Amino acid sequence: MKSRLLTVFALTFSIISPATATPNYTVGGDRPVTVNLPDTLANPAPLLILLHSASTSGAHQENYMHLGPVAKKNGLIYIAPDGMINPEGKRFWNASKSCCNRYKQEVDDVDYINSLIDEISKKTPVDPKRIYLIGHSNGAFMSFTFACKTNKVAAIVAIAGAMDTESDCTPSTPVSLLNIHGTADKTIKVTGGVMNNFPYTSATKTVKTIASVNKCSNLATSKKDFEPTIKGTETTVINYACNTHTHLQFWKIANGSHSPKLPTDFAEQVISFLLKQSK
């Protein structure tokens, strides 16, 4: 009788206990990055890649955006890799002529990100139709470049980024985009500018470039309170209607800075946008 009770208890405990999380692992060779896996891993599962701003790191960017817990809860494989280190000891992505390889170092970050995707895909079932990028500043430039040079990206969230004016950005397949930019950004100006002696696009031109690829038009405009330190509904949301399966939005933050204060539900907002997108 006692053994029977122990058996029943063991079965009951196994039913009510949560499943053991799949252990994280490292990829990337001499530029290692931790692959963060969700507790429940779909087959296949979406992959989220966070690309940091110049002079920071993947860990710093995660500390700013707090994507990890929300990615984990929503079944996303998640990585926040680091760019190369320049002679000043600062990290960067070799995204374009204007941003931000100041010392013209020989580094192919498109190849590096590709290699991360390939290495992860060999170990974990990545859904090739749901690969997402979130980039800030230099990381946003890198997100656009990677999407333009490969056909792997389903959607991008870009904060305070742009493209080279002379860029021939023509993704072979449509890419969904949520573009966020503050009008008071003094680093990457919303109206466009010059860095490293090369011009970069305005936020409007950046969005129009993707809109052309996605065959979008028929703008609808609304307001929202996004930046918590600016009073009122400071953010204009420009929503495009696209003739493809993609979605395109431009959130323009009135008086928003280069690194705007993010709302507490920022991760939920952007991951919700991404998870609606597929190639």
For the regions a language model picked out, list residue spans one by one.
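Sec-dependent N-terminal signal peptides
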Residues: L5-I15
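Boundary at the C-terminal end of the N-terminal hydrophobic targeting segment
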Residues: A19-A21
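Serine-hydrolase catalytic machinery in alpha/beta-hydrolase-like enzymes
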Residues: N24-Y132, M142-T145, T264-A267
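The conserved beta1-alpha1 loop
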Residues: I49-S55, A160, H181-G182, A254
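Alpha/beta-hydrolase active-site loop signature
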Residues: S55, I85-N86, M163, D185, ...
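Primarily recognizes the serine-hydrolase "nucleophile elbow" in alpha/beta-hydrolase
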Residues: K122-P174
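The feature captures the conserved acid-bearing segment of alpha/beta-hydrolase catalytic domains
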Residues: A155-T221, E227-I230, N239-N243
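C-terminal catalytic histidine-bearing segment of alpha/beta-hydrolase fold enzymes
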Residues: S176-I180, V213-K279
